[in-house]
Structure formats: structure tokens, C-alpha cells
Amino acid sequence: MSLPYDSSRRKFMKQCVIGGVTIYSAPMLMNSVHAAENNPIEKIRANWSTDNKPNFRFDAIEKVTGQKIYGRDYRAVDMPDWPNEQHHALIIRASIANRVYLGFDISFLPADIQPYKVITAEDLAANNIDLIEEFGGNMLLEKGKTPDYLGQEIAVLLFDSFAAFNKAKGRIQFNKDVVQYGEQTAVVADAKDPYAAWRIVREEGPLGLADHYSTLQDGLFFPNYVERRPVWPDAENSMADNGKRGMYYAEQLQNDVANRDDWFVLDRTYQTQSIEPMAFEPESYNGWYDRAAKTLHIVISSQSAQHFYYHAGHVIAKSPLASDIKNVVVHTPYIGGGFGAKDHTQFAYYGILASMFAKAPVRIANDRFEQFQYGLKRHPFKMANQLAFDKKTKKITGLVSDMEVDGGGRINFSGSVTMVGASALQGVYYIPRNDITAVCYPSQTPHAGSMRGYGTLQSMSAMEMMFNEAAAELDIDPIELRKINALKPGERNTQGARPNGDMRYVEMLEMAEKHPTWINRQSAKQAFEAKNPGKLYGVGFGIVSKDYGTGAAAPSSSVELTPEGKIIVKTCSVEMGTGIDTSQGNLVSKYLGSAADEVEMAVTEEFDAMELFDTDSPYIISQDRQDEMSNNPRWTPVVSMATAASMSSFYQTQTTEQAARILFEKTLFPAAVEIWRNRYFNGELATPDFLDISEARWSEQGLTIKGYPPIDLATLASKAHLDGMITGVMTHAFNRWAWASAEFEINGELQRYPLDAIAVKRGIGARNVKTNRFGYQVIERKSVDYPKTQLNNAMVTYYAPCATLAEIAVEKASGKVEILSTHTWLEPGKVLVEQLVEGQIEGGLTMGVGHALYEYLPRNEHGAGNGTWNLNRYQVPLAQHNGVWNMNYTLLPPLSESDPAKGIGEVVMIPVVPALIEAIYQATNTRFYHTPVRAKDIVEAL
């Protein structure tokens, strides 16, 4: 079949030029049914949201009718203007990482299934091809070298038919004789310096005054590396050297932890595991190098489409093989799940490599074995923690932690995952003094990346496990100990920064301690075990507060009105099952009186209408440099952002909502005022009494004010277009733990918005308006106020808290854990769509159950990197493991209607982990200091 496109949607407009290669973006791929006129689906969808609440997900109809097509499903024949011929690629990978690679042999394949091209490291060297710099080198392993990691790519094989590809793959995959290895060597990672090292030191000052020392106040300091281990500065109370002074306070704290008799110190070491994200769809790529048109067409499945979009040209521009490529068209379809597994991966770059050599469109698609071997994993953490309490007051007096993080074989966000994990260790507690060290080391394991939780699952679970044990040692109720130590509004985090807003931790704890399962846990244990002599009963609790955002969020959105009054919303976020299209499409109803008729996700090129550019890393840019660049109204610290870090509900909402607000304030309300003035008021004789925009309200019939007739959106849109008013608003924002704001002059009025870029599109009646090639007019900001670069040292200030109470039974004979019930408390801020929040709670809890009880990958040659792992060996939690019929939750209501929505996609996964570990202790009287706690561990303990 072919894929018809509305021609207006296929006008690929120039985005940017990288090394002479012009990068374009195509709209979201759609099934051919969408091309039918008078599509009944559109009539059904017209009622998808009423009274500002969605009746079903925006993409629900496509889901149930089979029209939601994922990138993995597209073949060349489905793509407009592509040849019908589809080629296929197979990647050969190393399954050993401690022997010299000598070569590979596929001569045993019959001639009719031999690849027509074998791409090796020699081809890369001859054609100057490599990965982008941030992934490191060695795109393909050279002969005579030891693999950098298990699963390293050796060669790419190209086949001209699926039959040949499939037969060849069946004979190559799992065949240990294909790749030859020589002498044994040391693991390559052992000779590399750490990927990153962080040290977070704080010494609180007098109440209400500045800290004696903190990361926010005094800045970060870093070690030297000697024999691949960090060597930190000498300790010295020197005002001239923040590193030495930081070490002075770290040393003081360590001495107190070791020697103070009035402190109780819990000293424990925790180990977490390597985990496979298990996204619904493994990664895939399809690409066609149209040599006649000098254009490379690409279909990717990525959470970070914009990152790939801006970097693909760099790979191509370097290579003489691709010197004829002048254009790259990037298609960004739906992706089947993410969890961080498809954020910032290098998979698509191997697709580009294949496309450069292929004779036709070529597809690379991991099967589940290959995804296990290649895909990003969750970082394993080893944490040696010392948590000190005052024996009398039960208040925390200090925290010392030494974390070692396994960063895998290729660097991928490992530095920031390590930093975020370290900064999250404090959980929901106020800690007056801390020395937290976190070092991320390369290893032979498959590369680890930004999997859901981003380091916080590992560190906060350990903190909660410590609190549960400390409560027992101090002979105090676990929730009471938490209430004593809960961080309160205005208190500082371990970096010395004040978290934004009211944390509401104590409120959540008070709700949990009143739950019947908690109140009756002792009597319930006696009754249950008497009734079930073969089982043990336990209840556990955990509470955490997860940051959301990256400290350099840069969302973009646009909201447009057609002449008929249809609303079109476009965002940079990728829909990967979380319902971003539903929430973003619905939230505009606040200002426009109706939800969106069309929502387009993963938009990239069109946002270049704002003509923005960036220059420096937003994390290390100096204040002087930021001040200098801010004078250019086209400059921003960051142009684009990935769909990650629980970004959509808070960050993406900012630009979507502001675009709708501007459209309402500058177009819809003025248009309505003119109609009311001319038709329903003696405007020539008196001043209207309906000029206060705050009094305007949307009703079912339209926009009304102070008793004047409602005017429907279609009428207002028609007038706006005929009069050449603003009918489309595009916005960009930047957030470094606070929003940038800027002044813009729109329609002659100067106003400050929490944005740093605006562009507008005017209606069909507009005359003599200069627009750029995208049809937009950039509204240059008059001034801008970016958050100070020092806020980078805060590491995080936005938090969303979540608590979970878990009730379990343990079968004595088998060690099997049965979840009887769970209750989750979540403070999500303003809820955009409750059903989507509920889905996150259920899905997050399931993933947490997997981390706590089931999911595990060995970190040596027996693990995922050897290519033999799949769901036949890897246990993910199923419905029977989750207690699905007793999975309950409470959403804390917002403090007011002005509360922002919070990013909760990750936090909902975390507290169930320590809750389950504690429940196992309460059942078995055995504490565990690792995850997962599997049935065999429990049997051994019993």
C-alpha cells in the first residue's frame, strides 16, 4: 500500500544546515485511512473531550481500529515516493569482552543468502565515519582489539531480501563459531578513567542564614584521577579554594560520624542490579538514500528525536562517502514505549551507516534477543551509606555516602545519572550535614542510560531501607521517625538549594499512618499466619520525593486556529504511551473553550520558525557568557529537549498553555469584544463594561461576559482570519529550576511572559506582514531574564512526592512473595488527566515490583551482553505478581487551582521497592541489602 499525504503536510521546509547537509523533518506518519474524506473517525473524535475533560485518549480510536502504527511497522512500500524494494541489515556483535577479536567468518552461508555488502571497521576508517563525539569512538570493533564491552558492534551485513536476511540470521545468531577470538586480555574498561565523579558537601549555617558550605553556594569541585581512581583535594579550611574547604567539612563530618557517642549511626552497604527496560517495541530504523535527489530519508523510533535531528548531519558531513547527501528527511512516528530505553541511543546512527552503503531502502530492527544484548540498561549502584541520628531527638545529624555506579561499556548519560542519584539520596528528609560521593566507572556490561528513575530509584530505595531499619534500632514507629525528619518548606536540600513550593511530606505521612493496613499490621500478622501456617505476613512502607526535569528544559509548542475554528496543537514531545497527546490536546480548553481537534507530536523542523540558536552547554556556561549571549534575541541556552525526565506535564504544558493564552488574550477576546460592541451595545454612545478579560468565561455555547451573548469559537476564528489577526502562536521556554521570562511587544502592548521566544502566524486577511519561510513572524523579545547559571549547582529544586504501603505474604516453602494489597499516595499538583495519572501509578508500581523482586541481569559474560537473553530467562512482573485487584491510590488535592502539574512518571515506581523489602523483613525477620530479593534469597534466609 502507499501512504497518501495531504500535500501541505509534505512541504519539508529548510531547518538548518550542518556541514552542508540540510536537515528536514517530516510530520508524524499516519495510516492511509486518514486520507479519506469525511472520515467517520474524525466525527467520533470531535467528542473526545467535553467540559474540559477527555472522554477517551486522543489516540484511542486509532488504537482500537488498528490505525496507530509504530515506526517499527513501516516498510519501504508504505512510504510515499520510496522504492518498493526493502533491504535488511544484520549487526554482528561481540559476546566476549576479555579476548582479542580476530575476525568473523560467514563463509558457511550458502551463496544465495550471503550479504551483498559487509561493513566493517575498515570501511569506517576508509570513509571517515564514526559516532557523534558524545558516544565515544569505535563504532565498529577493529581486528586485533579487545571489545570495549559485551555486545559491541563488529559488522553490519546488508541483504537484498527478507528471505535471505532471515535465513542468514538464523544461522549466524547464537552461532559461537562466527566470531573468532584470540588471547585473553584484561577488560578494556579497567584501563579507563571514570565517566564522572561528584561530591556533594553541605554544612548548614545558623538558622535562617547562609550555609557554612554547600554546593549551591560554593560551587562544585572535582578530583584528579590516579590509576583510574578519584583523588580529591586535601582538606583545608581555606576561603581561597572551595575544593579544599569542601573536603574540610567532609572530613569534619566523617570524624563526628566515627566518634560521637551521642549519635546513633546506621552503617550499611546496598547493591542494585542491572535491568532491561523492556519497552513494548525493540528499537528499529528504516532509511533510504535517494542518490538521484541527494537525500537521505530516515524513519526512527526515538524518545529524543530532536537530539538525533540536530546531530545526524554531523555524522554525514564528515564522510566523503556521503559527500553527495545534501538533505536528510527525518520521520518521527509513534514509538512503542520508552522508559528511557530509546532516549539518546546510538542505534539510529548504525542505520545511517547501513543506508550509506545500501542499494535500496534498508531496515534494521532488533528482535528481543538483540535488544537485550544491545539496549540501554539501568545503572547498577553500590552504596556504602552512614546515616547518623541524635539519640535523644531522633533527628538526622549527618549523612556520609560513597556510591560506585556501573556505567557500562559506552558512555550514555552516565555522568548525569550518577549526579542525580547522588542528589536524590536524601529522599524526603532534612539533612543538616552531608558528604555524598558518587563515581561512575566504565565496565564490560552493555551501556547503561537514562532508564526510568535516572539513578534515584537506586539511591532513594536505599535511604528508605535505612530509615526502616533505623526505626527498629531506635525503637520508634517508622512513620513517626519520618515525620520527625521530614524536610519542611524553606529548608534546604543536600546541595543547599531550597526546593520549590510546599513539600507536603508530613501531610502524606499522616495520611499513611491512619491507613487500616498500617494501624492493624501486628494483629493482622497474627491472624493471617494462624490461618495460613505455610505463609508469613508483613507490611512495609516507603516514601520518596523524585525530581522532575533536567535543569535545562527547553519545550516548544504551537497552537493554531483554522478559519473553521479547528484547534491544532503541536509539541516537541514524543508520544510513547504516556498520553502526552491527550493531556496537551485537552489543556488548551482552559483558554480556547475546546480541546484540540488535531495534536501533532514529535514536531522538530517547524519550531525553527522561532529562528533560535544555542552555543554552549547550559550546564557549564558562565554567567558572563550567558549575559553576553542574552543580548541576542535569537539566542537561547538550549533549543530543544528530549521526551524524558517526567517532562511533559510541567515543562511541555508551559509552552502549550502560554501559546493558548496568548491566542486568547490577543485574538479571541479582542474579536469577541468587537462583536459585542458592534452588535449588542451602543458603543458609539458609551464605554463598554465588558473590557476586563478576567471576567470572560467559556460556556457550552461559546465565549461570554457579563450577560452578553456567547460567541462560538468558529465565529471568532472566522473573524480573526478575515481581519488578519493572530491565528497561530508558537512558543519556546527555558527552565533552569526556574522559568526564564522575557518582555514582548504584541499588538502594540508590552508584556512579560514566562517564555524566551514567541512567533506568530496571522490570518488569511493579513496584508503586508513579513514572515519567514515557515509563515511565522518572530516577535523579538525586548529583554530577557534567564535563571542564574549558579542554579546549575542546585542540581534539582522541583520535586513530586509519593508513598506506598505494601501488604504481602511469603510462602515458606518456595520463598514466593504474594502482594496482597498496595496503597499509593501521590502529590501530583494540578491533575491534567486523572486516568493518565492512574495509569502511571499502576505501571510505575509494576516496574517497581520488578526491580524489587524479579528483574536481574548478571553483569558478566553470562548477562545480557552475550545475546542469549529473552523473556524465557528474564522475569518481568505479570498481573499475578502485582495484586491488581487491591491496587489502590490517593491523590492529594492541589493547594489551589493555580498549582502547576508535576512530573510524576518516575516517582510512582520508587517507594514500592523499599516498602516490599521492609515487608519481607517484617514477614521473615531477615533484612536484605540488595535488589532484587528473589524467592531463592528468601528460601536461603529462612
Regions found by a protein language model. Name each.
Residues 34-217:
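Flexible, low-hydrophobicity surface segments
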